Amino acid sequence: MIHKGHLKEGKSLLAPYLPTTSSTSPYSEGGALYGLGIIHANHGEGITQYLLSALNEHAASETIQHGACLGLGVAGMASGNRAIFNSLADVLNSDRAVAGEAAGIAIGLVMLGTGDEQALNLLIPYAHNTQHEKIIRGIAMGIALVMYAKEAKADSLIEQLLQDKVPIFLRAHSAILS
């Protein structure tokens, strides 16, 4: 958090850890992508293209994708950016537990407080179709973030989640209420 807001220097500060052709560690690289998103939190216009490229170029590494998803989520927070949403949806649809969990959370961050129907129509059915509990947890948090501050508009979704057979949705219910 010490570098949050250093938009101009962010990439150079993290350069030794960012993904390159001579890979160091996928954990360092994924963490650096997430850190880059934090530096550009809610001011991500200048870095989202880089993060989207990293997300697509490193599709073979769930760890790097995890960091890129979270970085995109934080950098594009509450932007409703459809390009980011679509890329995150592709990661979610790959049905890989680690990257999918981050994609679910990141979709919620990008669509924070929008109540976006398209996001909800992706997340809720997907949670029923996947066998990965990690993905379901990420989706539950994502749903809560999408419905952030929607108050009465969230009531029907809250009722739906209360009746749902997916127990983790009770967490989403609780988070939406808070």
Predicted regions: what they are:
Residues 1-178:
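Alpha-solenoid helical-repeat scaffolds
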